[in-house]
Design a protein with these regions (language model features):
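Generic preference for hydrophobic/aromatic residues in regular secondary structure cores
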Residues: 18, 33, 41, 46, ...
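Feature captures C-terminal
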Residues: 38, 43-44, 127, 131-274
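Functional cores that coordinate and move charged inorganic groups
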Residues: 1-100, 128
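Short N-terminal helix-initiation segments at or just after the protein's N-terminus
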Residues: 5-7, 119-126, 213-218
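Generic detector of short, locally flexible boundary/turn motifs and exposed helical patches
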Residues: 9-14, 22-28, 109-115, 143-147, ...
Length: 274
């Protein structure tokens, strides 16, 4: 985030910590299969199967022993597609009751959308997609202010009947709704940080409004070029505010009032849903 943290600590370990033959990476959702040379001059295999189980890390290790000691080793790796292996009948039989229970739950109709909503407009301003999350958070929690971000980079819920499974397009993971007591200043500062991660400081109409990477992330040259992850791009509801993208961090956000027109105070404590 914002250049404050190591993006690829696993590669740093492979290159700078002697003693490893293989480093298995994960979490960053970018495929990797290559050998790097560490500071001791040894070869280290680095592998990352990315996400969703589409491929797995497949490694062959051949070791030659002499008098109980390793005299030679050959290490090779490939990313192997899982699709050709098909579905395990034994696995499906074992978990069929649980599968049926989940299918029944996620197939419940819970409403209807009169038009398709997408995360894409959320990066440029108010959007129906994020407004829905804000509305739900405020209504369910009774909070005064809501903070929410597009947790899925590019997704949509199509016009028509809406089912429980569609809600995973809103919030894909097991995130729970919480309320916190925050001062007005803390709300303001949280938004300042969000828009600093989200928006570029524009100096002319030709500048990008979004904060984009100068160079692709290592191992993900084909990825969209946000400098920071979109799930950090929090907007707020329950307040009326403006964002001036020509201003520096700390001066971008101006909170004008609460949504009902009553004054917003920096030193007042507010209940915030997130």
């Amino acid at each position: 985030m914002g250049g404050k943290y190591r993006e690829n600590a696993s590669l740093d370990v492979a290159r700078n910590v002697p003693g490893f033959d293989i480093v298995l990476m994960g979490h960053d959702h970018a495929r990797e299969c290559k050998k790097v040379q560490n500071v001791a001059g040894d070869s280290v295999l680095v592998m990352d199967p990315a996400s969703n189980g589409i491929v797995v890390s497949d490694i062959d290790i051949t070791v030659t022993l002499r008098n109980g000691k390793v005299t030679d080793k050959q290490i090779d790796g490939v990313l192997t597609e899982t699709a050709p292996y098909g579905i395990s009948g034994e696995f499906m039989k074992r978990f069929s009751p649980q599968y049926a229970t989940i299918q029944d739950f996620v197939s419940k109709r819970i409403g209807r959308f009169t038009k398709t909503v997408s995360t894409r407009p959320a990066y440029f301003g108010s959007s129906a997609f994020i407004d829905l999350i804000h509305t739900l958070q405020l209504d369910i929690s009774g909070a005064e202010i809501s903070l929410a971000a597009p947790l899925s980079y590019d997704t949509q819920i199509k016009e028509g009947d809406i089912y429980v499974y569609d809600m995973f397009n809103l919030y894909k993971y097991e995130n729970m709704l919480y309320t916190m007591k925050l001062s007005g200043k803390e709300v303001h500062d949280a938004l300042e940080m969000s828009y600093d991660l989200w928006t570029n400081r524009m100096t002319s109409p030709d500048d990008h409004i979004l904060l984009l990477r100068d160079q692709p992330r290592e191992g993900a040259a084909d990825r969209a070029a946000f400098k920071n992850f979109s799930f950090n791009f929090d907007s707020a509801a329950g307040i009326i505010y403006t964002v001036d993208v020509t201003k520096p961090c700390g001066s971008k956000v101006t909170i004008l009032s609460m949504a009902d027109g009553t004054p917003f105070h920096m030193d007042k404590m507010y209940t915030v849903a997130l």
